[in-house]
């Protein structure tokens, strides 16, 4: 039996890779329509994405091959989808994030904020979560987790070592007292209950679990707050521009931030309370002097570890100052471009009729280019005071970024993945597959929109535990957009909750890279992640549902079916 299982596992990739296209052939043979040929490509990509038989980024290139061969789209129409405005926005933000990581500005920000928060365990965990979430808004979730977890580990190791030292000192004092007491007539020696030591070991394990989980959860939650913070948000923006080109910039950096930041903070606080209750319940019995001493020593050592890590960074360098300036400039330009409640700098010279010539992508690429120009060292203009060695060096110092670092650090695969999603959306629209799916979903018009949103959010949250969150949103959003247009509800009322639900990957180590990084440290079992992650999924879906049905309605005007959703751009 074992050998048969091994044999099947060995050839699983081969079978899926070559037999999946063959088994799907009846679809295009029995239904000789363009939308069926498009469905063939999408189903095949979904199978390859979920099974990972070839790299996800390479699967994303299948539309370039199959859409022209099956006469769904011509090659020029497909290829242009891989460098859309949305992809350039994401690429620009990735380059800026690379500069932040290269000069370790994110580490300085993290340690400074943690020192400010304090070292009481509950506050420390909240501090780690807020710092991780904040950094994850601007740089990748994976990079944030990879940077934060070593800090957590170093701090916990020192705290545990301090606890052991305090316990040893306490036991020595007790032993001396008992030796003195034993010399008295009628005295009895009382031995320490081993259950006390066992309980302390369990508390230490729970502390490790809580601190590790809080980082990976905060990374996933924090990325939802900005339009470029995580892949699903970028997919939503791209699908809106592709499926609803007349939506008039309803989805931009400022409008998304106004909606998503409160939701992110709500989810973060709920996650903190849940982890605190599940792993770090305050023990009311611990009110004795020795426990108070241990607690103070633990807090002191945590503060010492954080301060030591911060000291290693040295003073703020010239390069860090310049990166901070570019980063701040990017955020200011994004928010002030077209804030909505007032005219932005876009209205000065870059609007002609209904055409907005400058988008968030323009700003991102501008700052990205700036990073290859701004120097990483202070230029020396006084030639008379330069040493012989300094005169041999070029006058203009090296820039903050160079191409070698950029091509190594930027995750180019996700750019292809996003492009594949936009190509799929274009194929759905052009082939008529979107409209066909919309007609099949017309019976849902009798169901309350809130119930539809809740059910779809649960489906997406379960799916994203098994496959990439970008692939999940890429597959589902065109279907949900067609359904919303068919039954007459605002497309964003369905698309936003499902986009956010794709980031609720809390239950499995393979669900998202931050989970895998934390799991690799060995403090967690799969069952630990499943137990806490299941409740986290429920809390996340509840938070998203509340957000969309309260301030989300005001930000995106979700109560009214928009005119731009009625317009179709389909050539069937």
From Swiss-Prot:
**What are the recorded GO MF terms, alphabetically?**
citrate transmembrane transporter activity; organic acid:sodium symporter activity; sodium:dicarboxylate symporter activity; succinate transmembrane transporter activity; tricarboxylic acid transmembrane transporter activity
InterPro entries this protein is in? Na/sul_symport_CS, SLC13A/DASS
According to UniProt, the tissues expressing it are described as:
Expressed in liver, testis and brain.
Q: How does activity depend on pH?
A: Optimum pH is 7.0.
Q: What glycosylation sites does the entry record?
A: 382, 566
Which residues, if any, are the signal sequence? none
In the UniProt record, does the keyword Transferase occur? no
Membrane-crossing ranges are 13-33, 53-73, 80-100, 124-144, 218-238, 255-275, 315-335, 357-377, 410-430, 443-463, 491-511, 532-552
Localization per record: Cell membrane
Look up and give the membrane topology term: Multi-pass membrane protein
Which family, according to UniProt?
Belongs to the SLC13A/DASS transporter (TC 2.A.47) family. NADC subfamily.
What protein does this entry describe? Na(+)/citrate cotransporter
The species this protein was found in: Rattus norvegicus
């Amino acid at each position: 039996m074992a050998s048969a299982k091994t044999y099947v596992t060995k050839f699983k990739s081969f079978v899926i890779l070559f037999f999946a296209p063959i088994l799907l052939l009846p679809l295009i043979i029995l239904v000789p329509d363009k939308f069926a040929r498009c469905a063939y490509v999408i189903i095949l990509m979904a199978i390859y994405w979920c099974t990972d038989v070839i790299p996800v980024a390479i699967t994303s290139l299948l539309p370039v091959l199959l859409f022209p061969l099956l006469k769904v789209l011509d090659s020029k129409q497909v290829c242009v989808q891989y460098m859309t405005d949305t992809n350039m926005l994401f690429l620009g933000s990735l380059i800026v994030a690379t500069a932040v990581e290269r000069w370790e500005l994110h580490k300085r920000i993290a340690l400074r904020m943690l020192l400010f928060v304090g070292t009481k365990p509950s506050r420390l965990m909240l501090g780690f979560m807020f710092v991780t979430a904040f950094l994850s808004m601007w740089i990748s979730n994976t990079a944030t987790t990879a940077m934060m977890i070593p800090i957590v580990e170093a701090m916990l190791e020192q705290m545990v070592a301090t606890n052991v030292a305090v316990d040893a000192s306490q036991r020595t004092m007790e032993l001396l007292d008992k030796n003195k007491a034993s010399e008295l007539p009628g005295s009895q020696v009382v031995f320490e209950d081993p259950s006390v030591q066992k309980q302390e070991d369990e508390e230490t394990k729970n502390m490790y679990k809580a601190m590790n989980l809080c980082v990976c959860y905060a990374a996933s939650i924090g990325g939802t707050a900005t339009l470029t913070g995580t892949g699903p948000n970028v997919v939503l923006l791209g699908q809106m521009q592709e499926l609803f080109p007349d939506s008039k910039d309803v989805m931009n950096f400022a409008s998304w931030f106004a909606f998503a930041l409160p939701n992110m903070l709500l989810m973060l606080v709920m996650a903190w309370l849940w982890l605190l209750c599940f792993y770090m319940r305050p023990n009311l019995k611990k009110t004795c002097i020795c426990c108070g001493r241990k607690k103070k020593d633990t807090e002191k050592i945590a503060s010492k570890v954080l301060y030591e890590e911060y000291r290693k960074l040295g003073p703020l360098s010239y390069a860090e100052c310049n990166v901070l300036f570019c980063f701040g400039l990017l955020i200011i330009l994004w928010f002030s471009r077209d804030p909505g409640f007032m005219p932005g700098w876009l209205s000065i010279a870059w609007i002609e009729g209904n055409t907005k010539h400058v988008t968030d992508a323009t700003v991102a690429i501008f700052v990205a280019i700036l990073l290859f120009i701004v120097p990483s060292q202070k230029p020396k203009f006084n030639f008379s005071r330069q040493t012989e060695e300094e005169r041999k060096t070029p006058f203009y110092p090296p820039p903050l970024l160079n191409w070698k670092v950029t091509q190594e650090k930027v995750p180019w695969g996700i750019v292809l993945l996003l492009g594949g999603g936009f190509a799929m959306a274009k194929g759905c629209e052009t082939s008529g597959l979107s409209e066909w799916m919309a007609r099949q979903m017309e019976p849902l018009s009798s169901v309350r929109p809130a119930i539809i949103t809740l059910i779809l959010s649960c489906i997406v949250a379960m799916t994203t535990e098994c496959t990439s969150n970008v692939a999940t949103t890429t597959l589902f959003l065109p279907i949900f957009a067609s359904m919303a247009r068919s039954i007459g509800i605002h497309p964003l009322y369905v698309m936003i909750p499902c986009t956010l639900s794709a980031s609720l990957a809390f239950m499995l180590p393979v669900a998202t890279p931050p989970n895998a990084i934390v799991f690799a440290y060995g403090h967690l079992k799969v069952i630990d992640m499943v137990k806490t992650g299941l409740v986290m999924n429920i809390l996340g879906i509840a938070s998203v549902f509340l957000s969309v049905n309260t301030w989300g309605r005001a930000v995106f005007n979700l109560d009214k079916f928009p005119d731009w959703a009625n317009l179709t751009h389909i050539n069937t």
